Amino acid sequence: MIIKSSEYAVSAVKEEQYPKDNLPEIALAGRSNVGKSSLINTLLKRKNLARTSSQPGKTQTLNFYLVNDDFYLVDVPGYGYAKVSQKRRQEFGEMIQDYLETRPNLKGLIILIDSRHEPTKDDISMYEYAQYLNIPILVVCTKMDKIKKNQTNKVMTGLRKKLDLNYDHVTVLTFSSVTKFHVTELGNWIEDKISQ
């Protein structure tokens, strides 16, 4: 996928605030601090388009990024951040649920999982929920530069077991925003989904 242009479009917490142009959308979901913003910046070759933070829980809205005037990448608030109140967590959950269930132009969901840790209950719930909704899924193991090369197979085996992955239906990629590992494959998956 060749990136010609990319820009922040809008932040939304409800359907009335979503873009109205019916362009296809690819959403990114994952735990707080898993690397969603870094993945967006790396993929779009922009240093600070999506704000990165070492402090978890910074993204609190659905952030839409217009790419090539052709489709949107949608950064979803991170889940599993303990320092957010129960009420706020519930609001995030409802916002994400409404988006995933009602958005007809959602063409795929990229679920990011930190390669240094096993998938959490929240990761598993998000994966199963997306499957239930029949949303095409790409699972991305982030921060691969932080683990030793000889640990890759162990990480992938653990992920496959924990999520009960069937590779016929779900694509899995390892990824690093530092080394740019699998950026091309990520772009190809997105291109395939938005063209369907």
From Swiss-Prot:
Residues 22-196 form the EngB-type G domain. One of its GO terms (biological process) is division septum assembly. Its cofactor is Mg(2+). It holds the Pfam family MMR_HSR1. One of its GO terms (cellular component) is cytosol. GTP binds at residues 30-37, 57-61, 75-78, 142-145, 175-177. InterPro entries: G_ENGB_dom (IPR030393), GTP-bd (IPR006073), GTP-bd_ribosome_bio_YsxC (IPR019987), P-loop_NTPase (IPR027417), Small_GTP-bd (IPR005225). Mg(2+) binds at S37, T59. One of its GO terms (molecular function) is metal ion binding. Belongs to the TRAFAC class TrmE-Era-EngA-EngB-Septin-like GTPase superfamily. EngB GTPase family. Necessary for normal cell division and for the maintenance of normal septation. HAMAP family: GTPase_EngB. This is Probable GTP-binding protein EngB.
